[in-house]
Amino acid sequence: MTSRPSSPLTPRLPLKSLTLAVGLSLGVTLPPASAAEVAAENTPHRYTIGAGPLHQVLAQFAVAAGVPLSFDPALLGNRQSPGLDGNYSVQQGFQQLLQGSGFDLVSSGGSGYTLAPHVEANGALELGATNINGQSAQDAEVYAGGQVARSARLGMLGTQSVKDVPFSVTSFTAQTIRDQQAQTVGDVLLNDASVRQSAGFGNFSQVFMIRGLPLNGDDISYNGLYGVLPRQIIATEALERVELFKGPNAFVNGVTPSGSGIGGGVNLQPKRAEDTPTRSVTLDAGGSGRTGGHIDLGQRFGEDNRFGARVNLLQREGDTGIDDEDQRSTLATLGLDYRGERLRLSADFGYQKQVINQGRPVVYLGAGLSKVPHAPSARDNYAQDWSYSQLEDTFGMARAEYDFSDNWTGYVAGGAKYTRENGVYSSLTLTDLAGNGRGGMLYSPHDEENKSLMAGLNGHLQTGPVSHQLNFGLAGMWGEQRSAYETIATSARYFNNLYDVVPRPRPVATSFGSDIHDPRIVGKNQIKSTAVADTLGFLDDRVLLTLGVRRQSIVVDGWNTVTGARNASYEESVTTPVYGLVIKPWEHVTFYANRIEGLAKGPTPPTSAVNRDATFAPVRSKQVEAGVRLDMDTYGASLGVYRIEQPSSYTGSDNVFRVDGEQINKGVELNLYGEPLDGLRLLGGATVMKTELDGTLNGSNDGNRAVGVPSFQLNLGADWDIPGIEGAVLSARMLRTGGQYVNAGNTLSLPTWNRFDLGSRYRFKLDEKAITLRANLENVANTAYWASANGGYLTQGTPRTLKVSATVDF
């Protein structure tokens, strides 16, 4: 990609001679090469250099080649290199090592050379020395347009180039978050055609359907660590990356805390202080008067900018686009880091609070309905004014990495969180097509404490012509859940209508579980795993074979909320393998395939289910996937096919949660991202899914489609720079989702729905300050539709919502 320097270029010199000097310390260079060395630089020689940090690999190669290079290693940040193995001339070797880094070799004005970002001028490649700032380094790590990153953190495998792994991975950047004014992780994930958003069991949590299978907010990792993030809704203001891993990922990341994530996982990367100070203030407004402010401050300190601090503060409150719904969001985070020559440390601390008053709930369907009632008006709210949800989380984690040598790096990380939730919920269960139904009441405080640890060792070695990337990992999480509830009997439920809601007084509770003011322990879980993997490289790493195995153990104890009696206790362990293959036959084309298995904690019934205290045994899943990627430097695309098998679970019309039979999801996915034409950025894709139930009770539902899985999903998104108006951009996006069934018997279904979004932004300077104005309009047509039937209940799509903001970067 093209990266523009932040300071004027020195006179440009074509890249001809590579008589270079190596000196990784600032101001330190080695003597220039002799004439004999210069003459020999184009002669290929055999080099075997292990993988490691790019600046170290460059130094080793230059010393081995007998040529000097002078540059500041901080310019390359934490970029990694797979090393070099084979016959190369000096020029070929440096080109191979710097490929995709965003940097090239340039003359420093004498006989020496340095590094500079890739610059394209008049169609010919000419390079000039420049000072590199933090933004330039970031630009080299993303596709043109800045929406999607080239690498992602893959748990025990560490940070990997997306094109070199046998899995389907997409990493969305902070720029995408800002430009789309995405306020939650769900807003970001909607950019991928394999993902749709549902709602939790009446408490306004976000549930993500990835490849037709749910991922709960509990099961999103933070910098590779599970169990330390807010469990229901996650704000985006402190995030640098939202990384989506499609398919079972227990091998890579370990077992998820709540047992979801078979269809895919999400890892969030926190913001870090950049070499250039960050001073950003954003004011925003949206919905029906909801306003907010966000402050983002970052600074590096000390020798070589080794110490960094990043602070993000957010407050947003007011009415949403749904009638009478009010939401307040508070976020405060602090990220600290240290980057030494061999030691890297980081610590992240956060506090988040979400309060939703009279939030629009999900809708249940009673027995006897012949079809699904149509969705109410997009802005209609069928919640009672006494319903609310309050979600409060305090969380933190620390991580350390140390390079024992150029080829071996160890890491250890630990974190914890405390969650306090309160809420009074009320959802309608419809009994006829006219929208009549009965509403309940559930008051359910919930406390949760988690502690999480992980450690590992990543290394590289060579055995003859075969390279090895070795990974050893340990992971563990310890959780404790406390809950209580007050509710009413079925006979005491109030009558109401979905299309003509009548305010009702809050019913008096008639059924109780535990002490509302001091909830008792209802669950404890221990999740531990050990994993080892080896990625073998053949033919100069043009063929990569990943072999791995993970030993997973789950210990779960459960207690009845009413009596306190133990009602579940089990311990189960399983060893699951992973096989992955990457073939790179041509420069821009990669083929990949994988077979991966996983073990997950048994599904948890919703609090609204009759058997809310039931505990289910762990479930085992497996996936087979194959695909091809196209990487054209400025843009990329991928096409893949997959098959996932896992036990099926759902809530029936009798309000009983069941695990029944096996669900098989088969799909074809297409993804497109980057900037194929100058000034035009694309972010979209399509997926077609076929699901099937097998082995159900008495075979009653065998061959039916699984609940809540659309037949297809289509995303078309584009960003366009307006010609003649520098800094002005228009954007548009279409979301189209195919029909899906609401019940396992396939007698009730939802129709296909469409949503159209528009956006614009304008960036300019005023008094040397960068100002960005943004406006995004979601659901332009204000279409009313049922967005999801996941779990056997209905989630309505958001109404037309206008978001505007102004950001000042000092």
Can you say where each PLM-predicted feature lies in the sequence?
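Gram-negative outer-membrane beta-barrel transporters
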Residues: L539-D540, G636, R643-E645, V659-A744, ...
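Outer-membrane beta-barrel translocator/receptor signature
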Residues: E237-E240, N249-A332, Y338-R344, T394, ...
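Surface-exposed extracellular loop regions of Gram-negative outer-membrane beta-barrel proteins
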Residues: V355-L369, W478-R482, V578, V582-E625, ...
